[in-house]
């Protein structure tokens, strides 16, 4: 416990909040170019082939981003929009690719949660 005089000399410093998505540098999204598109396996109890992409952002960061949804059209040199948001069972994946924006098309035959996967309202 500091004395009153010690607090007068130098006030208490507030804790600096550490961002969970530093590559975005405070922006909601960033544009980037895919340098590698591949699949990877999740941590233990889960088993799958998760689709991820290595992306070079406009902020000069090289990150790993998750490709959500079933099926995608991304390949090397595809221009994508990246948002924050980690994937709990993939270590080191702290970003998501935004579907239906730039070179990434929306998910085919998606009828529920369409806005999350870049799908327009179906004609009925």
UniProtKB/Swiss-Prot annotation:
Compartments reported by the entry: Plastid
Example GO biological process: translation
Plastid is among the record's keywords: yes
Top-rank taxon, per record: Eukaryota
GO MF annotations in UniProt: rRNA binding; structural constituent of ribosome
GO-annotated cellular components: plastid; small ribosomal subunit
UniProt cross-references to SUPFAM superfamilies, sorted A to Z: Nucleic acid-binding proteins (SSF50249)
Main localization category: plastid
PROSITE patterns linked: RIBOSOMAL_S12 (PS00055)
Biased composition (Basic residues): 10-20
Region (Disordered): 1-28
HAMAP family: Ribosomal_uS12_B
Family in the record: Belongs to the universal ribosomal protein uS12 family.
Stated role: With S4 and S5 plays an important role in translational accuracy. Located at the interface of the 30S and 50S subunits.
NCBIfam families, per the entry: rpsL_bact
Subunit structure and binding partners: Part of the 30S ribosomal subunit.
Name this protein carries in UniProt: Small ribosomal subunit protein uS12c
Organism in which the protein naturally occurs: Prototheca wickerhamii
The organism's taxonomic lineage, starting at the top: Eukaryota, Viridiplantae, Chlorophyta, core chlorophytes, Trebouxiophyceae
